[in-house]
Amino acid sequence: MQQEHKSDLHCHLNGSFSDEFLEKTAVKNGCLQVFAELMEVKEKYFQLTKQQPQEGFSLDSINLIWKQFALVHKIVRDLEDIKNGVVDVVSHSVKYLEIRTTPKEMGNGTIEQYIESFEQGLIEANQVHKNKKAVGLLSLDRTIHTVEDARRYIHYIKKSPHGVLVGLDISGNPIAKRTLSGKDLEKVIQLAFANQLPIAIHMGECDSGIERQDTDIVLAAIEQFAISEARFKQGNPLHGKVRLGHCIFLSKEQKEKIRELQAPIEVCPTCHSKLNWHLEKSVHPVTEIYNDISAPIIPGTDDAGIFGSSGKKEFAKCKSLFFNKHQLEDDDIKNHQAKFRFSNP
């Protein structure tokens, strides 16, 4: 069997389906013309983004990312597709996988039925691929969800008997108007901690006033948690409980605070390059926080089906971005990164 990287801790379901699964699903749903259009767009995108120009990719190229997502959403239409899609993602992925998805009404199904289908996909994937482990995070979209939605997700995760849902994710379009911001964002983080649920938070994805404000709120909330937990737990209380996604656009003070807290950061190298968050002739922005692979850094694919990445590729790219002062072997690095998982193997 091909050597697989141990883990992928930043994987969004809808961006990670294989072409084979999407074609099969398009046949089932009678929309092969949509799949054909998706393949045309993917090929065009691949040709345009083989190598990053010095000034970065054009806006037209970046817009092809969002076009791919729109077409995927037209193909994946019902709860059966969600369940089968989870199995597909796990079958093409690494040995330990944390998949995120934003529950939604789909077809005639309710939000709760969506979550049940997501769970069933994880259960089936773990049964089929006994050499792997897949767990799920429920994503709160900061542009549509509220504190009450967070309570609902937390309640569902806590009462679920299956043990495959392990935490929350906060994501969503960083430049759109936000429904989860300020005090409400703080409340969601506090609710997760109060219920002993891990939380992954997308952060520093754009250079705006509200993003800077919310980043300060996130860092203050996790610092308060770290202080309150320090007397009860050996080691860093944030490890295995909190991960920060991307962390590209940050102030000097925010970078210093993350470094002080030793908060884990999810780095998705291909995604960062394709969105011009990292111009490859320059150092990666996260190296201004942590510059060595022995720091709390975790590679992720983000959207493997869209960006054409894989756990193995992202691990290698991530290594190339940071120093390795201690000359750690790959297995040592992977074991180190396993500390930041939200679930035990």
Q: Where are the regions that the model predicts?
A:
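Metal-cofactor-binding active-site regions of metalloenzymes
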Residues: M1-I199, M203-P345
